[in-house]
Amino acid sequence: MPEATGAVVAFERATKRYPGADAPAVNELSLEIPAGEICVLVGPSGCGKTTSMKMVNRLIEPTGGRITIDGRDVMSLPAVQLRRGIGYVIQQVGLFPHFTIADNTGVVPSLLGWDRARIRERTDELLELVGLPPAEYRDRYPTELSGGERQRVGVARALAADPPVMLMDEPFGAVDPIRRERLQNEFLRLQERVRKTVIFVTHDVDEAIKMGDRIAILQRGGILAQYDTPAAILANPASEFVERFVGADRGLKRLSLARVRDLQLLEPVVVHAGEDRAEVRRRLGAGADVAYALLVDAERRPLGWIDQHDLRGGGPIDAAAATPGAPTVEPETTLRDALSTLLGSSVQLGVVVDERERVLGLVSVDAIGDRLRAPVRGADGRLHDVDGEVAAAS
């Protein structure tokens, strides 16, 4: 794993009280976020999660306590200087409509006085990193991009000056569910490379479980209800409030803690149009993991399933004979999302593909079910079953 380039962020009894308010918006929040981890702030409306995040870059000034980045109090720097050293991604992206994509990405380096050659090199590097080839995207304008593409530019812009800390305020909340899952997976893949310290705000507990190395659950009045890893929170909710907020299906939510890459993938019987039917029948009958062949194109991208009925007789396989719609998932897809996708498939199998949609292997509903039934170790060091109860010793 790459070395973390993030910084330790610590809240020390951080408080925000607005004039005339009966209670503080954030009440003596204390927690420490290790360098290179994603900490998700989650809770109901009015719990102070966004306020807590904005106190880090002082878009909202704290009225008590301290917030430090690698031991340095955020109040010790001028606010503008502080913000230029912290990445910031918001739900509506906030790109300048009259700037090109390259200019939007390079805003902070430009403010920091970088020369043009260095800015161009950095923007091209980041656009490539977020999956937007610079030759194709750098001279476009925001209105020429899809919502998902604009959000990728927002992430690239936040990384432009290589900040140790990134703040993300419901960054994927404004896109449709399919694009949202893709963006989540892409960001997790990116985080494995850049290892920033990320403070991520969401109201969605499922997103918190998927994205967070640690989760801070806040309740109304800005009170910290629990701060721990997703696995520990699901195994041992600290209070009735946390248990209600996480929901009754804690066992199913545990599937969000594991990803497709954590499973042993099945080996597909990959075929191309024009291959001999008899040879494919032989391969399917020779100890294959599955009863279906997977038709792929010349780039090894899935086109559909071929079953025994399609293989009757002799001669070459016709691409039109394949049953289209083989569901695809990525290695970063959570097992919960994968299960939801696979349950809509008549063959109960999903095709695992890379970022270029090339086949890596297959995942089955049965394999996900086995993972769901397996006990997990909670914060108390004991194994817990799918309902959070202490599992019997084997």
Regions found by a protein language model. Name each.
Residues 57:
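Helix-to-loop junction immediately C-terminal to a conserved catalytic motif
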Residues 140-145, 149:
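Conserved ABC ATPase signature
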Residues 117-136:
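Conserved ABC ATPase "signature" region
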Residues 269-291, 295-297, 315, 327-356, ...:
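The conserved cystathionine-beta-synthase
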Residues 162:
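Conserved catalytic motifs of ABC-family nucleotide-binding domains
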Residues 102-110, 120, 124:
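Short helical segment in ABC ATPase nucleotide-binding domains corresponding to the A-loop/adjacent helical element
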Residues 73-87, 111:
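ABC ATPase NBD coupling module
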